[in-house]
Amino acid sequence: MLFHYLYPLHTEISFFNLFRYITFRTIYGGLTAFLICFLLGPWVINRLSRMQIGQFIQNDGPETHFEKEGTPTMGGILILFSLGVSTLLWADLTNHYILITLLSMLLFGAIGFIDDYLMQVKKRNMGFTARGKFLVQIMAGLVISYLVYLCPDFDTSLSIPFLKNFTPDLGIWYIPFATLVIVGTSNAVNLTDGLDGLAIGPIIIAGVTYMIFAYVASHITIASYLQVKHIASCGEITIVCGILAGAGLGFLWFNAHPAQVFMGDTGSIPLGAILGTIAVITKQEILLLVVGGLFVIEALSVIIQVGYFKLSKGKRVFRMAPLHHHFELKGWPESKVIVRFWIIAITLALISLSTLKIR
């Protein structure tokens, strides 16, 4: 919005020429998102507390979690609001990738909100049924994937890390593949969101990482030098990534241990979907397995635990899944689990960035 209204004034006032630069709008978009979260956070937390929308702790969880009972949840509203407003202010709203990313946030945000609403307000213990939620996510993912597929400059070939000459073209089959990426990431982030700041930290890290990927892909000279597929229109996604990181930092101010608020499904489900959508748009969908490796590990721990439990008729691989609970039950303090998982996320992000040179 600011781009559309202020940039045309650059012929009269040279300062407004800054608004044509993606780097400028990325930095100030991120700062705007941070400030919105930081300033509105206390009001949102107080409002959620007054509405008695508090976290429910299951009896089979770690004992240290019982003190979290009643902590305001559905704080994802704060993240999505700051993300949406900042994107509307700083991004080019005529860019189709921006509109698709915003739609992804709205669709999956609605799914997460309804799930939280059923649990917290209507007091349905588990919200959506697992099958029902997955079906709705698939439908939303198909819509987003189809819209990306229709974009005139979008390529349905895959970018395989370390194999620059191997780019299989999926054609129409890219739609179900992209749906799998978006829905899978959405659920993986949701599973990771079990400790104070555990999910939002890696989201910030992934946002910064994809900010670099998006900028590289949109810059024809850099993309050519690094042998990365050039996608001119995805430059605006750089701004969304910066805003995602800024909103995440603003939320982390209140979500850091001991948390004053939890994001709930209202935050984790759409944030994962946004990350998956960005990975698809920037043609770094395979590399998301590395960038979001922590989310992958957490999701795999649940799959392994459930599968082994059924096959072995009651035996477990981990003391509890997702994996972060396993380490808690081994005696690790919550803060140690969180920071060590963040370190893993940073390491994986650095490895993924190295693929820009190792091709």
From Swiss-Prot:
Cellular localisation: Cell inner membrane
Q: How does it sit in the membrane?
A: Multi-pass membrane protein
Superkingdom per UniProt = Bacteria
Q: GO terms for molecular function, please?
A: metal ion binding; phospho-N-acetylmuramoyl-pentapeptide-transferase activity; UDP-N-acetylmuramoyl-L-alanyl-D-glutamyl-meso-2,6-diaminopimelyl-D-alanyl-D-alanine:undecaprenyl-phosphate transferase activity
What cofactors does this protein use?
Answer: Mg(2+)
- Membrane-spanning parts: 26-46, 73-93, 98-118, 134-154, 166-186, 197-217, 234-254, 261-281, 286-306, 338-358
Where primarily located? Answer: membrane
Question: What is the role of this chain?
Answer: Catalyzes the initial step of the lipid cycle reactions in the biosynthesis of the cell wall peptidoglycan: transfers peptidoglycan precursor phospho-MurNAc-pentapeptide from UDP-MurNAc-pentapeptide onto the lipid carrier undecaprenyl phosphate, yielding undecaprenyl-pyrophosphoryl-MurNAc-pentapeptide, known as lipid I.
Please give the GO cellular component terms listed in this UniProt entry.
plasma membrane
- Which transformation does this protein catalyse, written as a reaction? UDP-N-acetyl-alpha-D-muramoyl-L-alanyl-gamma-D-glutamyl-meso-2,6-diaminopimeloyl-D-alanyl-D-alanine + di-trans,octa-cis-undecaprenyl phosphate = di-trans,octa-cis-undecaprenyl diphospho-N-acetyl-alpha-D-muramoyl-L-alanyl-D-glutamyl-meso-2,6-diaminopimeloyl-D-alanyl-D-alanine + UMP
Q: In which pathway does it act?
A: Cell wall biogenesis; peptidoglycan biosynthesis
Which Enzyme Commission number(s) are on file for it?
Answer: 2.7.8.13
Q: By what name is this protein known?
A: Phospho-N-acetylmuramoyl-pentapeptide-transferase
Q: Does the keyword DNA repair apply?
A: no
